[in-house]
Amino acid sequence: QGDNIQYEATITASNPIGLLYGAYELIRLQNTDAYNTGSGNQQNFSKAIDETEKPQVGLRILNHWDNLDGSIERGYAGKSIFKWEEIKLGKKGKGGSISKSLHDRLITYARANASLGINGSVLNNVNASPKMMTAEYINKVKVIANILRPYGIRVYLSINFASPMALGYTKTADPLDKKVQQWWQKKAKEIYATIPDFGGFLVKANSEGQPGPGDYHRTHADGANMLADAVKPYGGIIMWRSFVYGANHKGEDRVKQAVSEFKDMDGKFRDNVILQSKNGPLDFQPREPYAPIFDNIKKTPQIAELQITQEYLGQSKHLTYLAPMWKEFFGFVNPSKLVGISGVANIGDDANWCGHPFSQANWYAFGRLAWNPSLSAEEIAHEWLVQTYENQDEKFTKPVEMMMMTSREACVNYMMPL
């Protein structure tokens, strides 16, 4: 309302979650004063606010490297927000109650993600504990899923490939073993009976000591397809990480090994298997080229894995704004060729969520770029600044935006070469 004229905004969408996204977009426009024409003219106002939004990729997922004991691998913002001990199950392990503090924290988490269009969350570390597949944790995951669902967020779980053997149900984890296949089929049935909209599994296999099909002279396709068959009846997906080195190609340049490992399997995966690959071929370095696997895999759907947490970029001690780095990546890898974008989360139970006051900007930037990779790093920095600090004075925004925009290059200059 301005100049005694009241305006109305209409939000339409194809589903209820779309309406929620639209409401958050309107709030963003208001908070950033994006439609201020300076004239009070209704025609100009209507033109400014008339827009249609559609996400570039379907899967926009946070990957939490959170362990069941509350620790976080590469976490720099306290302990995990998923306080499993604060979820109490009812009789026979069903039902469940949750502490008010955890419930409130998860609601805030869900709202923050929904405001960015993030629609998935992998709750646990890719270096996964087999305990994640027990009935106790599956029922606790249900409690979290029920909280996130109204905000359009589906839950996923990382799995330990050797779970049936580690939990004592089979003598092997060979993906071609009938008993192993049956165990995963029953486990998938159990999970989907508990959480009908469960998203699927994220898998780190035969990488950095994790078990996998290679332990039994089987291929990644053998392992992924076995799991894919188990979740297929329920609409689930398998996100199989290509971060594999030192298994079958020892001595070869590490940056080539993902292609060497997976290229010959391209086209041999089930249609609900997606290869998830880090943006660079080495390991989330401050500057490295885009991973060649994005050029070499033609028939298998792919997800790009970005790292929001600053493992090699100052952890949560340094201001390092990562949107320029991700824009550099998308300048080489066309997002239209991807089915999803995942981000290794930088979230913890610190009061400010991300450790460093400016690290929230990277969570925000990930969500905005996953929704619309054509946004500029400058636009996103400005959006985050004026919404976070509620200050649109250019005497504040201009120097701080410049500090953000130059921070990644500064980090490269003092972190590189390796």
Report residues per predicted region.
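Feature activates predominantly on carbohydrate-active enzymes
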Residues: G2-Q185, K189, A193-L202, K232
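Substrate-binding groove of N-acetylhexosamine-processing glycoside hydrolases
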Residues: A48-E51, A193, P211, R218-L418
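Active-site-proximal beta-alpha loop/turn segments in soluble metabolic enzymes
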Residues: M165-D174, K204-D215, F243-D253
